[in-house]
Amino acid sequence: MITQLKEKVLNGGQITREEAILLSNAVDKQALYRAAGEIRDKRVGRRFDTCSIINARSGRCSENCKWCAQSALFKTNIEEYELVDEKTCLDLARSNADYGVDKFSFVTSGRALSDKNIDRICTFAVKIKSQSDLQLCASMGLLKKAQLQKLMDAGITRYHCNLESSADYFGTLCTSHTPADKIETIRAAQEIGMEVCSGGIIGMGESMEDRIDLALMLRELGIKS
């Protein structure tokens, strides 16, 4: 079964949910890992990009995601600040560029970054692009298309928005927003030409079927990273 499904994927096919469940129950895990490695080698090779982030806004988040220390609803003793200053941001970007990092991402806490702070980030981005070859990314919550377009115009070409878990399990982990909210942001970013990276967190009590459903939704959305 493993070899048959491997060849199916290598020849351009896609496995079904039922086939994925069968693979997850395979007794010979080493054979499964080898098959996955062959698919990886053909599809993406063994090179990877390096992506560094700046925690550009920390804490004070209104959302109730159980896994996240940024939520204002939990006592985590993290440092809280509204937005980093320009010098801190530019210095860190320059340092990462000097180390050969490929991508630099602005990551902010909160359901969605405010328009005022988006404008400030855009100012930072324009200056970073003028001083380096870094590809700029952002993870700023549930932004709308017009806000994403501002980022794109400033040189931020990739947006990150994790689905975190399957649609069925997500409500166990977070009730202040939904998978549909996340998908709306992902599709808005794609519609204006942004690259999108998305994924999830493994080990929060979800089942193997939840992990498979998460992977299938990422595939449906055309996520490559």
Language model features with spans:
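Auxiliary Fe-S-binding modules of radical SAM enzymes
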Residues: 1-30, 219-225
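Conserved, mostly hydrophobic/aromatic
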Residues: 12, 36, 65, 106, ...
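N-terminal pre-triad scaffold of radical SAM enzymes
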Residues: 33-74, 81-105
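Hydrophobic faces of well-ordered beta-strands that scaffold small-molecule active sites
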Residues: 48-52, 104, 136-138, 159-161, ...
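Glycine-rich, proline-tolerant flexible connector loops at the mouths of alpha/beta enzymes
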Residues: 51-54, 77-78, 104-117, 169-170
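Canonical radical SAM enzyme core domain
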Residues: 77-90, 113-158, 163-167, 181, ...
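A structural motif
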Residues: 98-101, 133, 156, 194, ...
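Conserved C-terminal portion of the radical SAM core fold
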Residues: 180-225
